[in-house]
Amino acid sequence: QHERIVTLANGYALTKREREILQYLSLGYGSVYISKTLFISDNTARTHIRNIYRKLDVSSREELLSLVNGMK
């Protein structure tokens, strides 16, 4: 799954931080956990998540996970 995330990150021009957050999202973690783990505000985590969704052209966690798991 890590390789798929790296491929997506490179293909969709995700930043290093967005790639890091995508990894957590793919493991099922939400913005609160991510913000505490990465020592950023919840609002910042949510902004990164919105940017990831926009760049990957997905609108839900389900779509995101399908893309990460190679089903889209």
How should each PLM-predicted stretch be described?
Residues 25-29, 68:
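Short helix-to-turn junction characteristic of helix-turn-helix DNA-binding domains
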